[in-house]
Amino acid sequence: MRYLTLMIIPLIIFSQSGLEIADMIDKRPAPTDLTNKTEMILKNSKGKTRTHGMISKSMDGNRKQIIWFMEPKDDRGISFLKIEHDDKDDEMRMWLPAFKRVRRISAKKRGDSFMGSDLSYEDLSSRELGKNDYKRLDDAQWLG
């Protein structure tokens, strides 16, 4: 019985809820300014892939972000700008060089697909912990 108790205690201590895990991630140190080069690979239902190469710059703890699309050639020059505000709706805009126009992403369009991906424009915004539900999934080994 003593050994069983010793085996169960660590499971209880280290068994965190989804909200506790999200809170721990939210509180970890993070850079205030960040620049990165990213590749987004989109795969359609037939297995054909399309790669988007982009450069992203985030400032003020990701409250301000600009993404420049570099690849493929027909998307080169498209830019996305996001500025988050505390006292009003966040700003989101796309520069579309083919039309020589800036397109504002309205609040009702935030759920639309971002550049043909499974991401929505809303997914690119910061999240407040209290506004979401969190569920811890079963532990599993991923990729080996």
Q: Where in the sequence are the language-model features?
A:
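Sec-dependent N-terminal signal peptides
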Residues: 3-14
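Flexible, processing/modification-adjacent segments and terminal tails
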Residues: 16-33, 39-41, 48-50, 74-76, ...
